[in-house]
A protein has these predicted regions:
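Bacterial N-terminal signal peptides
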Residues: 10-16
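N-terminal edge beta-strand
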Residues: 22-45
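Beta-strand-rich interaction surfaces with strong enrichment in secreted/lumenal proteins
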Residues: 29-30, 94-95, 109-115
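Low-complexity, serine/threonine/proline/glycine-rich extracellular segments that form mucin-like
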Residues: 39-75
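Low-complexity, intrinsically disordered segments enriched in Ser/Thr together with acidic residues
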Residues: 108-130
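A surface/secretory-pathway sequence property marking extracellular, secreted
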Residues: 65-103
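Bacterial N-terminal signal peptides that target proteins for export
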Residues: 1-8
Length: 131
């Protein structure tokens, strides 16, 4: 059951990322992750396909049940987060109750686009995964 939830999480993140103005080849670095743990996750985005626009923004929708999200800053990209209220508070570090979590992570406006030469950009974040 835990592996199924982990695979579903990876699929949800990948699907959310590819919906955007440019089509690119994306790889989620962790296909299975342990449920109930805090995990470092990365979406690797390559160049836009031939004939499509260059990749100039990346959006990741965080699925329900994922809490305590922190975002890695990608050099030369602007990062923003959109928050959502949790249905009920969950315990965080030091006994502090968490009442909201990141709903979406958006990286945009890079100083230079991802080149089409087989390179990629990694968009990382850390999240507490559901059980």
């Amino acid at each position: 059951m835990k592996n199924n939830a982990s695979i579903a999480l990876a699929a949800a993140l990948t699907t959310a990322l590819t919906a955007g103005p440019a089509i690119s080849h994306n790889t989620f670095t962790a296909m299975t992750v342990p449920a109930g743990y805090i995990q470092d996750l990365e979406m690797r985005v390559t160049h836009g396909c031939k004939g499509s626009s260059p990749v100039n923004s990346v959006r990741i929708k965080i699925p329900e049940g994922v809490t305590r999200v922190s975002v890695n800053v990608v050099r030369d990209w602007k990062v923003e987060t959109k928050m959502r209220k949790l249905p009920k508070p969950v315990p965080g570090e030091g006994g502090v109750m968490i009442t909201e979590t990141v709903d979406e992570i958006m990286w945009s406006a890079p100083k230079s686009m991802i080149p089409a030469s087989g390179s990629y950009e990694g968009f990382r974040f850390r999240a507490h995964l559901p059980n």
